[in-house]
Amino acid sequence: MEVISTNTNGSTIFKNGAIPMNGYQNGTSKHQNGHQNGTSEHRNGHQNGISEHQNGHKNGTSEHQNGHQNGTSEQQNGTISHDNGNELQLLGSSNSIKPGWFSEFSALWPGEAFSLKVEKLLFQGKSDYQDVMLFESATYGKVLTLDGAIQHTENGGFPYTEMIVHLPLGSIPNPKKVLIIGGGIGFTLFEMLRYPSIEKIDIVEIDDVVVDVSRKFFPYLAANFNDPRVTLVLGDGAAFVKAAQAGYYDAIIVDSSDPIGPAKDLFERPFFEAVAKALRPGGVVCTQAESIWLHMHIIKQIIANCRQVFKGSVNYAWTTVPTYPTGVIGYMLCSTEGPEVDFKNPINPIDKETTQVKSKLAPLKFYNSDIHKAAFILPSFARSMIES
């Protein structure tokens, strides 16, 4: 594995055995604004609903009420201090904090929120780009949040990852060179390695803290960064694509944040033009494209931009993810002019035999050829707006 770093930060050891993170300290590090184009796998623009994490009751009588010390934790001046020395900043508004729960709020889904019960806080810190937190949940295993938004759950995020990889790669024959923008935790790479035809994978992740969290808490994923076919680049994904060799990649996967704030450029015409230039004739791109229940106005704008750039085909697909807002997420799938790409009928499906025999990975949990085809069947209200 080749690692190319554009970061120049120092190194600091965290309290309580937390991983070294380039000058960050749990809950107290300076958070520098001015994110570069959202290349890490996260959704921006959310308020942090950081919940109080209770690290074990004493003799069945511990209870935290009205900010009073109960022997196990103390809440003062916007922080929660625990026996083990961890200190959580309460980054959300006071009414978003529920004992033992994490809650996700955003202006993108006003009037609703999603909450998970916290069993154990594993890591919290601030990088140069975002707040990073990992906790063990009661229902979905490890949960990664960036800027207060759930990015991936260990036991519930596989539909998103399998679909963002296999919808595009299952639609072209023998993909060899692939670029992932974002994906620093490693789930997307894990799925991509199912394809024996792949010879080269470039991963561009802006936030080295995300990669460090993967190495510490997801070693089975981080191990794939050492695959000889993989090059991990720590830097700006949009700049990387712009500088890429013309016609180099068979596929580009944009595992990015929401199209607001620092990630806004990743959904606009100049970025798509750079992507199209970096793809071979008949090459494909797949990017996260929001929820039809909340963001039809955003989806319509993304489609309009893609139709101006990609002269092959432009398609919208969707799937279900239990821990994302409204329980669904969408994808834009586009191809460049050249050999025809029919996204709705996979020609390179990853079935159980391929998975078990060739890639030596566990069988897929969500994706199959029927799910692939069904992903492009839209409800009437969405279809009429998208096809107009």
Curated annotation (Swiss-Prot):
InterPro entries: PABS, PABS_CS, Putrescine_N-MeTfrase, SAM-dependent_MTases_sf, Spermi_synthase, Spermidine_synt_N, Spermidine_synt_N_sf. Residues 1-14, 23-39, 46-88 have a biased composition (Polar residues). Keywords: Alkaloid metabolism, Methyltransferase, Polyamine biosynthesis, S-adenosyl-L-methionine, Transferase. It comes from the Eukaryota. Residues 99-336 form the PABS domain. One of its GO terms (biological process) is methylation. It comes from Nicotiana attenuata. This is Putrescine N-methyltransferase 3. Its EC number is 2.1.1.53. One of its GO terms (molecular function) is spermidine synthase activity. Involved in the biosynthesis of pyridine alkaloid natural products, leading mainly to the production of anabasine, anatabine, nicotine and nornicotine, effective deterrents against herbivores with antiparasitic and pesticide properties (neurotoxins); nornicotine serves as the precursor in the synthesis of the carcinogen compound N'-nitrosonornicotine (NNN). Methyltransferase that mediates the conversion of putrescine to N-methylputrescine. One of its GO terms (cellular component) is cytosol. The lineage of its organism: Eukaryota, Viridiplantae, Streptophyta, Embryophyta, Tracheophyta. NCBIfam families: PRK00811.1, speE. HAMAP family: Spermidine_synth. The active site is at residue 255. It catalyses: putrescine + S-adenosyl-L-methionine = N-methylputrescine + S-adenosyl-L-homocysteine + H(+). Pathway: Alkaloid biosynthesis; nicotine biosynthesis. SUPFAM superfamilies: S-adenosyl-L-methionine-dependent methyltransferases (SSF53335). PROSITE patterns: PABS_1 (PS01330), PABS_2 (PS51006), SAM_MT_PUTRESCINE (PS51615). It is an enzyme of class 2 (transferase).
